[in-house]
Amino acid sequence: MIQMQTILDVADNSGARRVMCIKVLGGSKRRYASVGDIIKVAVKDAVPRGRVKKGDVYNAVVVRTAKGVRRPDGALIKFDNNAAVLLNNKLEPLGTRIFGPVTRELRTERFMKIVSLAPEVL
């Protein structure tokens, strides 16, 4: 469950380390984002010679949440941290590698690239 001002780890090699959610996309009254939702983020911490700089604003997709995601069979998949993958304006991943597991909920046509790059899909 991600809302405005939430700090997330970055799960790709785009050069950002931590980002802050500045908007949950998908309607003016939308308050929370979960796994698979697109959010607008600001880079708060970046590696020195990375692709992105501190202060840059990007779209991102949430790939892990500490709140977890409930499956239709009743299983609850939780993670230790909140993490996102940065996207460009065409909603393609900025990085070329994904770190850590991602959930099966990302297996939509839009995010198949992220699922294929991930080392583990839960």
UniProtKB/Swiss-Prot annotation:
PROSITE patterns: RIBOSOMAL_L14. One of its GO terms (biological process) is translation. The keyword Heme does not apply. SMART domains: Ribosomal_L14. GO terms for molecular function: large ribosomal subunit rRNA binding; structural constituent of ribosome. Keywords: Ribonucleoprotein, Ribosomal protein, RNA-binding, rRNA-binding. It comes from the Bacteria. One of its GO terms (cellular component) is cytosolic large ribosomal subunit. InterPro entries: Ribosomal_uL14, Ribosomal_uL14_bac-type, Ribosomal_uL14_CS, Ribosomal_uL14_sf. Binds to 23S rRNA. Forms part of two intersubunit bridges in the 70S ribosome. Part of the 50S ribosomal subunit. Forms a cluster with proteins L3 and L19. In the 70S ribosome, L14 and L19 interact and together make contacts with the 16S rRNA in bridges B5 and B8. Belongs to the universal ribosomal protein uL14 family. This is Large ribosomal subunit protein uL14.
